[in-house]
Regions:
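Short, conserved micro-motifs composed of acidic
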Residues: 1-166, 170-180, 185, 190-194
């Protein structure tokens, strides 16, 4: 019998791919994140694949969960974090998991955060009437809870910015009505508008 552990399984909705953590030999550290696949629901899982160094480290990677078939959430004490186990996200792009990024505050703390799961039920922010960017649950042993690991609910609301300014003619310093202004976001998004004085 194996003396290794296979823990924290997350099975995809189609039931053909499963993600899990294991300390089987050949990994990068203690526990690594792996996936296994099968051709049909009645078949056994096989093709066990380590998710590689963008996800796994010499430390512990545990509690995998996929969202939208392209976002892997997991906990790690091997990536640079805030302390203990932090929750990280890695994007699946061209069949390759990208470098994991820390979810930062308020999700992570200097304590342990594990078991990120999203609530995909559609709902609107009562203030802005916009859809929430995300909401879900995770567990943490941070202070202020009721015991060991407590379950926390989170809501990530859309960021709403208000920008004001003026466009002046460089020579006359007169305000220009109807000038086109373009705002470009760090993600490549853009918004165009006209000045109105």
């Amino acid at each position: 019998p194996d003396s290794f552990n296979y823990v924290h399984p997350f099975i995809m909705e189609d039931e053909l791919t499963i993600y899990f953590a294991s300390n089987i030999p050949g990994g990068y550290g203690g526990y690594d994140i792996y996936k296994a696949t099968r051709a049909k629901k009645s078949a056994k899982f096989s093709n066990i694949t380590n998710l590689g160094p963008n996800v796994n480290t010499p430390g512990q990677e545990v509690f995998p969960a996929m969202r939208d078939d392209s976002l892997l959430y997991f906990s790690s004490d091997g990536h640079v974090g805030m302390g203990g186990l932090d929750i990280f996200v890695s994007v699946l792009k061209n069949n390759q998991f990208q470098q994991a990024e820390n979810m930062m505050v308020p999700i992570n703390s200097c304590w342990d955060e594990i078991g990120m799961i999203y609530d995909e039920t559609p709902s609107l922010d009562p203030k802005s009437k916009s859809p929430y960017l995300a909401k879900g649950f995770f567990s943490s042993n941070r202070p202020g809870g009721r015991g060991g690991d407590d379950i926390y609910y989170f809501v990530l609301r859309p960021l709403v910015y208000s920008i004001a300014g003026f466009v002046k003619d460089a020579a006359t310093l007169q305000y220009i009505d109807g000038a086109e202004v373009e705002i470009i976001g760090s993600d490549g998004s853009s918004y165009k508008t006209l000045t109105d004085i």
